[in-house]
Regions:
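Hydrophobic beta-strand-centered segment that forms part of the acyl-chain substrate-binding groove
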Residues: 36-87
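Catalytic strand-loop segment that frames the active site of acyl-thioester-processing enzymes
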Residues: 1-36
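A broad, structural micro-motif
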Residues: 20, 54-56, 102
Length: 140
């Protein structure tokens, strides 16, 4: 199931050239992912309070068009894989005024016990409802 996160570009996200700085695209993806998590599973703060974190293993993407200050955009994302504790996402960032695809990327993460930064191998057993919901959300 694809999911959308919408907002406008903020001034501090742009660089001297007047476009969103490349480092901020990962922040936009994180904002979208945190909203997705809260809307579909559990808020990240509740997850952390239960002793679980979600480190990023990899992220990559292509910059296809520019976003500028105050441009409205949406991040269209989907969970493309979930293997027990490891998960992968695909993203598209689209300027909603022009409908231009501005960025296309992927990221990989995993559930870990807070402080360990190692895969939470008993995640399925310890969080069966969350595991079940996560499995149902996968859209390859």
């Amino acid at each position: 199931m694809s999911w959308e996160y919408k907002r406008r570009v903020k001034d501090y996200e742009t660089d001297r050239m007047g476009v969103v700085h490349h480092s901020n695209y990962l922040r936009l993806l994180e904002d979208a992912r945190m909203d997705w998590l809260g809307d579909n599973l559990i808020s990240y703060s509740k997850l952390e309070k239960s002793g679980v974190i979600i480190p990023c293993v990899s992220a990559s993407g292509d910059f296809l068009n520019y976003l500028r200050y105050d441009d409205p955009f949406k991040v269209v994302m989907r969970l493309t894989g979930f293997k027990g504790v490891k998960m992968s996402f695909a993203y598209e960032i689209i300027n909603t005024d022009t409908n231009e695809l501005c960025y296309k990327g992927v990221s990989s993460h995993f559930f870990a016990k807070d402080g360990s930064y190692k895969p939470y191998l008993s995640f399925r057993k310890d969080f069966p409802e969350l595991y079940k919901k996560m499995t149902a959300l996968v859209e390859p």
